[in-house]
Curated annotation (Swiss-Prot):
Gene source species: Hyphomonas neptunium (strain ATCC 15444)
Cofactor binding: number and manner: Reduced FMN (FMNH(2)).
Gene3D superfamilies to which the protein is assigned, alphabetical: Chorismate synthase AroC
UniProt key word Repressor: no
Protein name: Chorismate synthase
Catalytic activity: 5-O-(1-carboxyvinyl)-3-phosphoshikimate = chorismate + phosphate
UniProt cross-references to PANTHER family, sorted A to Z: CHORISMATE SYNTHASE
Membership in a protein family: Belongs to the chorismate synthase family.
Assembly behavior: Homotetramer.
């Protein structure tokens, strides 16, 4: 299996499976001299960690990260710092229940990667989905923490869930602080209460539901990205679509721009102090593939979890028609834990863009 690496200068390779002994990543291209230790990375892994509420999988994993290489400390450094060599990070799996999956080892879960993997490789790890499991995203979150060090403290990355099932937040109620007060990363306190009732019913019914995640990057300077085939928004879209269960991406106004007039969609400008003052951000912070200095805004549609308790029609590897239900511990809405993953992918793309911009322009 190839294509386990993304990025150009800031390159991340993830490895490992859902029910293997461990998973992790190798990061190449990180500049030397950046402060980096395990507790810094751990804070982001804890945001994604399973078993934190009844609305996510009850698999109990500490997700404790271990730094295996690329970081050094002695009496001449101010704490652990990156050396510029590959950074290897590892997270052990400790709560696998592979026996839960024996019933489906020869049966395909509709909507999952089972059938496609079998057709391509002729073999698949049915235990939790192997590489196709959302468990792989723990490594991405770890890499995203390193990317944040590359970006520095002037760039703020934040994410939220803005829709679960048919229930969408009211943008007028948006409060970033509220995302820390509920298990959904919801910026609308009123909608968070509705989601709790809705997801309880979904969970008890044995089904699952989808979500929309929105991530923002503030403080990105104008000029990152490149025209045509190196567009920053194209890099962002590709990174977000690589997330497990992602089925759609919007940047800025996204598909709503199709119903706007030219005047409505224009991000009109007025003179500011050191930079233009934009009157709108329908471009989502990117124009012509290059950052404008506005907030970068990306939304990701996350499909319902494919592994559900309710029976669905499928076939076996031999073509026999069967009904499939998945016994195990699964997220009723995997979109909730996709928030720190989307933040991490945003961080990695921007870190790569920063290094590429510096290499091309010298600043």
């Amino acid at each position: 299996m190839s294509h386990n690496t993304f990025g150009h200068l800031f390159r991340v390779t993830t490895w490992g499976e859902s029910h293997g002994p461990a998973l992790g990543c190798v990061i190449d291209g990180c500049p030397p001299g950046l402060s980096l230790d395990a507790p810094f990375i751990q804070q982001f892994l804890d945001k994604r960690r399973p078993g934190t509420s009844r609305f996510v999988t009850q698999r109990q994993e500490a997700d404790e990260v271990k730094i295996l290489s690329g970081v050094f400390e002695d009496d001449r450094t101010d704490g652990p710092v990156t050396t510029g060599t590959p950074i290897s990070l590892m997270i052990e799996n400790t709560d696998q229940r592979s026996k839960d999956y024996r019933e489906i080892r020869d049966r395909y879960r509709p909507g999952h990667a089972d059938y496609a993997y079998d057709q391509k490789y002729g073999v698949r790890d049915y235990r939790g989905g192997g590489r196709s499991s959302a468990r792989e995203t723990a490594a991405r979150v770890a890499a995203g923490a390193v990317a944040r060090r590359v970006l520095g403290e002037d760039i703020l990355l934040r994410g939220a869930v803005v829709q679960i099932g048919p229930h969408m937040i009211d943008p007028k109620n948006w409060d970033w602080a509220e995302t820390q007060n509920n298990p959904f990363w919801c910026p609308d306190a009123k909608m968070a209460a509705q989601w709790e009732t809705y997801l309880d019913s979904v969970r008890k019914s044995g089904s699952s539901t989808g979500a929309i995640v929105e991530v923002h990057a503030s403080g990105v300077p104008a000029g990152w990205g490149a025209p045509v085939y190196g567009k920053l928004d194209a890099e962002l879209a590709g990174a977000m679509m690589s997330i497990n269960a992602a089925k759609g991406v919007e940047i800025g106004a996204g598909f709503a721009a199709a119903s706007m007039s030219g005047e409505e969609n224009a991000d009109e400008m007025r003179a500011g102090n050191d930079a233009p003052r934009f009157l709108a951000n329908n471009n989502g912070g990117v124009a012509g593939g290059i950052s404008t200095g506005q907030d970068i805004v990306v939304r990701i549609a996350i499909k319902p979890t494919s592994s559900i308790l309710n029976e669905v029609k499928s076939i076996t590897r031999d073509g026999e028609e069967v009904d499939v239900r998945t016994i195990g511990r699964h997220d009723p809405c995997v979109g909730i834990r996709a928030v720190p993953v989307a933040e991490a992918m945003l961080a990695c793309v921007l870190a790569d863009a920063k290094l590429r911009h510096r290499g091309q322009t010298g600043h």
